[in-house]
Amino acid sequence: MGIPVRSLLVASIVLSSIALHVAAAKNLDPYKVLGVDKSASQRDIQKAFHKLSLKYHPDKNKSKGAQEKFAEINNAYDILSDEEKRKNYDLYGDEKGNPGFGGGNFGNREGYTYFTGGGAKTSHFSSGDGWQTMGGQGNTKTFSFSFGGGNPGAGGGNPFNFDFGDVFSNIFSGGSMGGSQHTGSAGKARRGTKSSGHDSSSVNIQEVTMQIFNKETADQGITWLLLFYTPNTKGQFVLESVVEDVARSLDGALRAGKVNCDHEKALCKKAGVSIGKSARLFIYSYTTTEKGSLHEYSGDYDSKSLKTFCQEHLPRFSKRVDINQFSFPSNIIPNLPQVLLLSAKKDTPAMWRAVSGMFRSRLIFYDAEVQDVSHPLLKSLGVKNIPALIGRSVNGEEQLLKDGISVKDLRSGIKELKNLLENFEKKNKKLASNQAKKPAHTDQPKENKIPLLTASNFEEICGEKTSVCILGIFKSSKAKENLEAVLSEISQKTLIRGQNYNSGNAVAYALLDGNKQSAFLSTFDKSAFKSSDKLLLAYKPRRGRYAVYDNEVTMEEAERFVVSVLNGDVQLSAAGRKPVLR
């Protein structure tokens, strides 16, 4: 039966159109398309592709020619990311017009063989152009195009078989659609080259299993970028590229990992992450709590946006203080040393936030902005240059750990700070151990550790994290000495100590100058303060209630008052307002 002339004519037109598309695409120099040199590394090629594909993605760029440009970019990357294809292009299809498909000289044996695959609306070309050696007769090479069936968001079918809704999809992925042996092999080869296209020198994105998550991620104090995906999800490739860029720029402050939810179903279920058509990116951070939690990233897929997101989610365990009003609190958390970073930064430095997460349950962190070293505290400790690190040991001694701290990048800075903090922590463990071993000497005066309550340390000592704040209020130096000795003795007694600060069940002790803080005292019972040289005030910040003891302050009576407050045996009065120190 003869073939109708009209059908032959239509087929001829279609084939001619396809051939023109192919020739035009192949005539473009992939190096020029991506804007890289012939000596470019795989990493350079990958970065160029990432940048251009985001710029010309049809979902974001609606200008005329963006879709065609996007196809050219993907086509160029498909060549240069595959070492075999790149080698063949350099030999036979470079911009100088050497014999080969890329130079426009088809020669003999460079013709096309058209055949139809088994899938609907799918057609294939076989060409001897040097793109991919597939074996078989004549070293025939194949690539495929799809008519119709494109991404709905791309405005109809696209002739290059790209999923324009996803720049990460495999280039020329028609291998599984057609019935051709050649096309299937080409598809497998191209899928295999996606992983090999990554530069080995790039930041390692670790495969995270349940075991690794429990051992290295969960509540370890380190911030993680975690990419959740399955082999069929879209977006993984470019997301990995962006994650690599950010992990490299924040190297030391965070780690990067990926979770295959097909293999790690239990981990993804535990994390509460379900995967649909697209990969999902989360940060595991400690922004507000002692325990880590996942926060999903929903911003643009570019390094700048993701880096900003990561910086916002770095740990915040360091309290920003005013150096002019700062003094180390003395008895907030027993046996925990305290550290203060002095820098010229207006905000808490990223490296200090990072290490505050790593040491969050082992040290108490502060930081302050300092523009010069003329402050009395800095002079007394011998600080000559900033940045500087000051520590307060468990025995109350304040010391300069290091000044003039110089680092070349974030990673080296974090390493330097970690070394300083680890050494300081070891010394304090020895101090605490030695103090525990020493016998008590009743004939020696005990060291007084009761701080003076000021505006700068009020929230730390008597803020809402504290259950009960016991204040010794004095109006003379003699009264101050007496109250300091009494409260220091009481604070050391285990029965009423109750200083579990992290759980919010702390009993804090402090002294208050009644002469200077009359406005603060006016919040409470004014009559008691007028006639007394010294008295005790028990204040519960969360409830805004208080009790006053204004009789003779002896060790026995003071202890009885504190125990009564803790046991709820004393009736508390409501404060007129929240007390404020000046």
Curated annotation (Swiss-Prot):
Residues 29-93 form the J domain. It is found in: Endoplasmic reticulum; Vacuole. Pfam families: DnaJ. SMART domains: DnaJ (SM00271). PROSITE patterns: DNAJ_1, DNAJ_2. Residues 407-437 form a coiled coil. Induction: By dithiothreitol- and tunicamycin-induced endoplasmic reticulum (ER) stress response. Induced by heat shock. Residues 1-25 form the signal peptide. GO terms for cellular component: endoplasmic reticulum; vacuole. Residues 178-201 are annotated as: Disordered. Keywords: Chaperone, Coiled coil, Endoplasmic reticulum, Glycoprotein, Signal, Vacuole. Interacts with BIP5. May play a role in protein folding in the endoplasmic reticulum. This is DnaJ protein ERDJ3A. It comes from Oryza sativa subsp. japonica.
